[in-house]
Amino acid sequence: KPGSLKALNCRVGKSRMENFCRQEEINFEICGKVIVAISEDELPALETIYQRGRTNGVRCEIISLEKLHELEPHVAGIQAVHVPEAGIVDFSQVSERFAERVREREGNKILCSTKVTGIRQTSRIIIETEKGEFEGRYLVNCAGLYSDKITAMTQTPGAKIIPFRGEYYKVRPGKNHLCRNLIYPVPDPNFPFLGVHFTRMINGSLECGPNAVLAFAREGYTRSTVNILELADILSYPGFMKLAAKYWKAGAGEMWRSFSKAAFVRALQRLIPEINADDLEPAPAGIRAQAVMDSGK
């Protein structure tokens, strides 16, 4: 939403990311994206996206079907928002370069596979780990799937992390021409996720997805990965129960697409009718660390 911290982070962070990539000679591309309305009932939501973008200072425009097909010839739809300044980058390269810059400064350390066991606060913040104690003026919590555990160690009330697995398919090279850049649907206002979309990667490959299904473990990157204790903790959390009650219908659809490739393909065909099941091969899944308050928000 305009004025939110997320909006500020997107706008300022994008500019700083581009500058960092230029300085570090990391390959990136400003390729643009389209957000496509498939039917008349999606036009009000598309207009809202456009107005929010303009309010946030994002260069964007509503384009006709003719203009849309100039940008993405294989897309179905009746209208779209074009965001020409959207871009792509290999974030593993970005992370590796950040790590290099951190290590270059005297006294800095990066400790991988190191468990935090406690946090104390006096005049400074003391982090207790399996490899000793570390102290500083500030603690930046970037623990992802375990960020709520870190927050709890500071005795600060906060949200619980609910893990949602996002499953992807990679489009076979012979069909990469179906998507030139980035193609998104109009998000369902009744569901807190974006919906399946097409993403061209910086190496030229094309991926589609993700869906959004409850993972049965914090690191449940596959359907067969189950952690009974973590799952019980999720299912007994009041915030999750309220979230599930509100979005159960959409969630059931997401779960069905997880088990049915045909259903996944049908969702993709709303954007690109020419895509079919034979064009897709499984790609690695990701886990979204969704912060959920007791209220279900």
Q: How should these model regions be labeled?
A:
Residues K1-G13, E24-F28, A215-A250:
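Glycine-rich active-site loop/strand segments that organize a redox cofactor
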Residues K1-K67, G77, V196, A217:
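Dinucleotide-binding Rossmann-like beta1-alpha1 core, especially the glycine-rich loop
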Residues E61-I63, K109-L111, E281:
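General small-molecule cofactor/ligand-binding pocket signal
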Residues E66-H69, I161-F164, K170, G174, ...:
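Flavin (FAD/FMN) cofactor-binding core of flavoprotein oxidoreductases
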Residues I119-N227:
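Flavin-dependent oxidoreductases
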Residues V81-Y138, C142, Y146-K149:
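Helical element adjacent to the flavin cofactor pocket in flavoenzyme catalytic cores
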Residues D41-A45, L71-I78, R120-I126, F134, ...:
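A short, glycine/Asx- and small/polar-enriched loop/turn
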Residues P2-V12, V36-L46, V81-E100, L111, ...:
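Short beta-strand to alpha-helix junction loop
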